[in-house]
Amino acid sequence: MDRSRRTQEDPDLGMLSGRTLFGLQRELFAALAEQGHPGLRPRHGAVLAYLDDDGSRATDLAARSGRHKQVIGTLVDELVELGYVERRRDPADRRAKLIVPTERGRDFIVRSDAILAELEAAHARAVGEQAYAEFKRVFRLVAARQAALTSDAGT
């Protein structure tokens, strides 16, 4: 069997993960654009998906998202310009800055969470609630194992 046929019939974990991620992102960001958030792109999720309500440090966002701190800094600059976050002094450490969602940012996060919950519910209905719950349980294990392997390798 040639490679292109094999990747269609029996895609590996990376291909399946990528297809799932990109498909979810297309659906999510199209819905968000219709709901008043047309300027955001999937890359902004590295900040907004991991941002605490009361703010997060850029170093924490980098660790949670797996992105380099410089990438997070660039994304935060874009999100500040778009009006989704602001930088504030961290009351716990006046030298540090917190990235805090604005009202627009909080609206985006609430809408995003609701859309993703509906997408997940639709998948659960399609494959069965129990099968979907088991899929998520196993996928979390695989993701955690992969993260541990990556961190053990020093990357």
Model-flagged regions — what are they?
Residues 26-71, 154-155:
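N-terminal helix-turn-helix DNA-binding core of bacterial DNA-binding proteins
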Residues 1-39:
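N-terminal leader segment of winged-helix/HTH proteins
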Residues 11, 15, 46, 121-122:
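Positions in alpha-helical segments
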Residues 17-20, 24, 28-31, 65, ...:
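Alpha-helical linker/hinge and terminal dimerization helices associated
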Residues 1-8, 130-155:
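C-terminal regulatory/oligomerization modules of transcriptional regulators
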Residues 19, 23, 73-74, 130, ...:
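Alpha-helical macromolecular-interaction surfaces
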Residues 18-21, 48, 52, 102, ...:
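Generic structural concept
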Residues 77-140:
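Charged, amphipathic alpha-helical coiled-coil/dimerization segments
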